[in-house]
Regions:
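Short structured motifs
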Residues: 29-33, 90-96, 117-119
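A generic structural signal for short beta-strands and their flanking turns/coil linkers
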Residues: 29, 41-43, 88-92, 102-106, ...
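Hot-dog-fold acyl-thioester-processing enzymes
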Residues: 52-72
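Residues located in well-ordered beta-strands
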Residues: 32, 93-95, 107-109, 135, ...
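Non-catalytic linker/capping segments at the edges of enzyme domains
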Residues: 1-44
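HotDog/MaoC-like acyl-thioester-processing domains
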Residues: 2-10, 100-101, 111-161
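Short, charge-patterned binding micro-sites
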Residues: 49
Length: 161
């Protein structure tokens, strides 16, 4: 069974957390889902410094920082909006503020306002391309990177409110 089917079948946040923590790219990057809210509205991801995710200058690989935040808004919104919606990651940018070392953390949340904006923007079948900022923090709470995630969201044809 493919990863997408497994994600869709994950009936609880606990099961999705377990699945994602055994996902090969996450294992290889040293990324771990630390917390997923039971209502799918918050995810906390951590990455500890390891020999296998350290670059030539002794800091975290930039790609590993991005992989920490990559699928989470998409996955949360897939669960929150249900099968009536198409949700894809469309684009992203990341700004590296300072070298990341030690344990890094990113928290992503979906608010009532975000869900309301999605439902309103897609009610007539239009695509919606929201942008969600994400910060990655070090152990002292300093921002090491800022990312901007753009999603593609559309209500599936033939679905009425």
């Amino acid at each position: 069974m493919g990863m997408l089917k497994r994600v869709k079948k994950a009936s609880s946040a606990k099961k999705l957390k377990r699945l994602m923590n055994w996902y090969g790219p996450y294992l290889g990057a040293g990324v771990r889902l630390d917390y997923i809210a039971d209502d799918w509205r918050e995810v906390r991801v951590v990455m500890n410094m390891r020999w296998y995710n350290r670059n030539a200058v002794g800091t975290h690989f930039g790609g590993s920082l991005y992989s920490m935040i990559d699928p989470h808004y998409m996955l949360m919104l897939m669960k929150l909006l249900g099968s009536d919606y198409v949700v894809w990651d469309k684009a992203a940018s990341i700004d590296f503020i300072k070298p990341g070392t030690g344990k890094l953390t990113a928290i992503m949340k979906v608010s009532d306002q975000m869900l309301g904006d999605i439902i309103q923007a897609t009610s007539a079948g239009n695509k919606y391309l929201p942008e969600y900022p994400v910060k990655i923090f070090d152990e002292s709470g300093e921002v090491v990177a800022k990312a901007l995630k753009t999603l593609y969201i559309r209500k599936k044809p033939g679905i009425t409110s």
